[in-house]
A protein has these predicted regions:
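Acidic/histidine-rich catalytic neighborhood of metal-dependent amide-processing enzymes
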Residues: 109-150
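Acidic/His- and Gly-rich active-site-bordering loop/insert found
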Residues: 2-104, 125-128
Length: 150
């Protein structure tokens, strides 16, 4: 049994992410995902910050376990946007088909985004001395024009 990963809980959380439209520029959906991720990290005792570089693309999320340190030992980077238009989440919500999990953004990259919370839980419990920084951007699918400098 892995104390940092529970498949049932992971799939429940993944359904929230996948069933939220978050195509690049879908600010409401990206903001919902950003808030969800920030709560997950805050629940682990991490510092979080929402960063908006362009209002029309939505926020990015930064989470750290040693926020006062300028050094980073472990950097996890991902994105919250997808290529799918508004309405796709309702048309194709998360489904589990045997060992396959399907839905808009399930593989790229909402499962990876959520997996960062499992890795953060591990670091917090097992290697708290490591300076962990997690960055989720809002515009990767169009080349990260607003978050690139971050």
């Amino acid at each position: 049994m892995n104390p940092y990963y529970n498949e049932s809980a992971f799939l429940q959380d993944l359904a929230i992410l996948v069933n939220t439209d978050s195509g690049t520029g879908t600010v409401e959906g990206i903001d919902k995902i950003a808030n969800f991720m920030m709560k997950k990290y805050a629940d682990l005792g991490m510092w979080t910050e929402k960063k908006t570089f362009r209002a029309d693309l939505g926020p990015c999320v930064e989470a750290r376990n040693h926020p006062k340190s300028k050094e980073i030992d472990l950097l996890l980077i991902g994105h919250m946007d997808t290529v799918f238009p508004v309405g796709t989440a309702a048309e194709r919500p998360l489904t589990v088909d045997g060992n396959r999990v399907l839905g808009p953004g399930a593989a790229d990259m909402k499962s990876g985004t959520l997996l960062c919370t499992c890795l953060a839980a591990f670091v917090q419990a097992e290697r708290p001395e490591l300076k962990l920084c997690i960055a989720h951007n809002c515009d990767e699918e169009i080349g990260s024009p607003s978050s690139d400098a971050w």
